[in-house]
């Protein structure tokens, strides 16, 4: 207790300077600097700069959204699910940003796997409405037209990679360009040609295409029997003149009587019967143009063999081609004499000439000549014509 009359002692003011040897953060002296890193590490849990976990969550959410966008942007989803599948979201949202279909939406599409319609725009739908509805075979609206599997990304986009459309129907890179599978060709379009590819349906173009196709098919077969020799095609230079062809069709020649025609008809029928009864007989087409220069072929007659070794008989018809009768292969017959093949129609010839003798059409010498059994030569017919 201070006594009265004593002097007043002055108290110095409080110094704000740190005391030497004392650490403010450590709260004590002597080695306080060693505790500083631990204190800072403890305070880092409360610093606002530590947002590593929050950033990871945002990155995962962004990756999930990107995956969803990629799934919505793939070709399969665009062609078969975009504006086809019903939207399952219950709350109100922007339909233009939603890839799914909504009730009453104009962009709604029919499922191309369920409804078989083409990618061609429906003309009635453009005018205001189509009465056929979902049963229509054409596309209703822009989305059905350009998102159809037959048209989606089959053409390149004019903007390329700089395109900023939310939904683009075209390809931006060569990898995105879709190549449709090759269509099955019809039997009529076997031969590929520029004319066949550019056919537009006009009658003149179709006629030219069929003509081209016929020539291509016939010329591609080296053994085709329908092709005429190149030097003298039947359509350009027929072996027979019109008068000669008409005479053959009428079955008569000027200046020759009817009995001669009967003889020739009998010979022709006899030769045909032999060919039909032979196992190696048949019709064939000429393999060369040598028969076109035959003087006997121009008369329209069968050239009967004058010897047993004759191989071929030719005939010229009114249709401008000359078939060959297959020869009777006498070499394959071992025991049969060739003369017997020539004389097989002797009885028929005797009956024919007996009839001609009664009619007085031929002389008695010719009758004796036929009775003798010698092989007949029809070269005398040319003398009668001349």
Curated annotation (Swiss-Prot):
Composition bias type Pro residues, residue spans: 230-241
Zinc finger residue extent: C3H1-type: 116-143, 151-175
Source organism (scientific name): Oryza sativa subsp. japonica (Rice)
Residues spanning the signal sequence: none
Biased composition (Low complexity): 220-229
InterPro entries assigned: Unkempt-like (IPR045234), Znf_CCCH (IPR000571)
Gene3D superfamilies (UniProt xref): 3.30.1370.210
Protein name as it appears in the record: Zinc finger CCCH domain-containing protein 2
Record key words, sorted: DNA-binding, Jasmonic acid signaling pathway, Metal-binding, Nucleus, Repeat, Zinc, Zinc-finger
